[in-house]
Amino acid sequence: MCIRDRAGRYPYLKWWERESEDDKRLALDCMEYTGTRELADKPVTEVSGGQKQRILLAKVLAQQTPVLFLDEPTTGLDMVYQEEIFRFARELALMGKTVLMVVHELNLAAKYCGRILLLGEGKLLADDTPERVFTEPLLSRAYAADIAVSRNPLNNNLEITTRVDEASKEKETALLKKICCE
């Protein structure tokens, strides 16, 4: 099966129907938007993980649903494609689509998402804007780790990182030396 077939509107067709020219055009437009049109005739087995993620997004777009649920859509992508997926999701939301994403890239979520639902301890800890949810106390609680939140001086975006205490770092380094060097 080639990529063009994967990105089409088959879920909406009866078993005896074929895609119309409009369906084919829509699939190609969605592939164009996600930067995968040049892959249309390639077998699915010949594309990278990042290309597969973008092809899956094209497939979702071709379904023309009002709600998109994207479960870790940036997994396995390099930083350029990760940002691209978040940008796509933001553009779709601005066009009136409801976009729900499960993500672990907090810095990108802070930059592109208008609303954040933070889960931790098996429950919903917060539901608000990135500035109100991505605070050190809430994130430290959610991740059971010491989290630092600051502003990037170059673009003023929220920047979220973990803090490593020196005692733990020294202990881990000593253990690693023991594992690797003895």
Residue ranges and their predicted role:
Residues R6, E21-L39, Q64:
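Conserved ABC ATPase "signature" region
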Residues E17, P43-V47, Q51:
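Conserved ABC ATPase signature
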Residues L68-D71:
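Catalytic Walker B motif of ABC-type/P-loop ATPase nucleotide-binding domains
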Residues V103-H104:
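H-loop/switch region of ABC-family ATPase nucleotide-binding domains
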Residues A109-K111:
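A short, surface-exposed alpha-helical micro-motif characterized by mixed small hydrophobic
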Residues E136, S140-E182:
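ABC ATPase nucleotide-binding domains
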